[in-house]
Amino acid sequence: MSPRMPNPSLVVPDVLPPMRALVKAVNSVGVPLKTLVLIHLRVSQINGRPVQIPKKQAEFEAAGEEDHRLPVVETWREQDCFTDAERSCLALAEAATRINDREDPVSDEVWEEAAKHWNEVELGAIVLHIGLVNLWNRVNVATKQEPVDWRINPKKWTPMTSRLAQAQAQPAASSSH
């Protein structure tokens, strides 16, 4: 798949720095990174955004992964390896992503279960994280951006990092509008 254009966050002036700042703020309130990763993966799965994750123990170890639950996130309800707090986030992520599936997409039951495990600031960060993942999924799908390898440690997201660096080095295409 060849991208239709560079990532819009690199093309539109002054967009990427505030988006990065928002991600940094969301990541700094105390929700464990592993929980945010589970949310990111589940939202991307729902949106049909391909995510390349290791499928075998040896691949996890070679990649330096710590969380061997990633391949079973799609079937989290049937798994016993997720905490109640993580389950509440996955349910909230599904509900907030599938907003057209039912009349009341995020039911009081889903919200109240999440609120049992997270304080208001953490819950706000989780909701914002869900929204940000949905935003990035839609941008990437619309512009046919290539999926990146999935890594728990953001420093290991080298395919995206190298693509961003390459795109930033190239001048943006001028518009005739």
List PLM regions with ranges:
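Hydrophobic alpha-helical segments
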Residues: M1-H177
